[in-house]
């Protein structure tokens, strides 16, 4: 088999080539945020984009503003609420302008009200950028906001 992303067969690439494709084409949002504790919000947002050679200060600032983080750019993750940390993780995932975003339970650690707010912001930004979003969630409410749903039951697509 093969894996084609943006018209490129990535299954034929070596490890270095696949890593380059991941850095420049994938944005990943983890349930546990996975922010770098020693970096402030601005540096956490910029991290992935810098690795991909795609850093744009204006774009990063725009993401921070769109996610309500403009007043928190010089704070460290431990100084932020869970919702703010997840917003940083979303901004980081979008900063390199990926074509595909993988989100693993992106609101799983948030209360219902914060989850709804963060999800609305994330979906608006994903729509604006034109990226595809693949999200794993146990929440029927969140799944209902997606254009297409696939259900996994006992390891099989149902």
Residue positions per predicted region:
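ABC family nucleotide-binding domain
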Residues: 1-145, 149
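H-loop (His-switch) and adjacent beta-strand-loop-beta switch element
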Residues: 146-158
């Amino acid at each position: 088999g093969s894996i084609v992303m943006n018209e490129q067969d990535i299954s034929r690439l070596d490890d270095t080539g696949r890593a380059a494709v991941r850095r420049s084409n994938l944005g990943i949002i983890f349930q546990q945020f996975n922010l770098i504790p020693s970096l402030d919000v601005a540096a956490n947002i910029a991290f992935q984009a810098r690795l991909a050679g795609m850093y744009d200060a204006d774009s990063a600032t725009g993401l921070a503003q769109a996610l309500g983080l403009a007043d928190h750019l010089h704070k460290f993750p431990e100084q932020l609420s869970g919702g703010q940390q997840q917003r940083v993780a979303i901004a980081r995932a979008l900063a390199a302008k990926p074509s595909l975003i993988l989100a693993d339970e992106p609101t799983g650690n948030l209360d219902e009200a914060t989850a709804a707010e963060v999800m609305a912001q994330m979906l608006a930004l994903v729509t604006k950028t034109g990226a595809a979003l693949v999200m794993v969630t146990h929440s029927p409410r969140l799944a209902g906001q997606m254009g297409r749903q696939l259900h996994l039951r006992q390891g099989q697509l149902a």
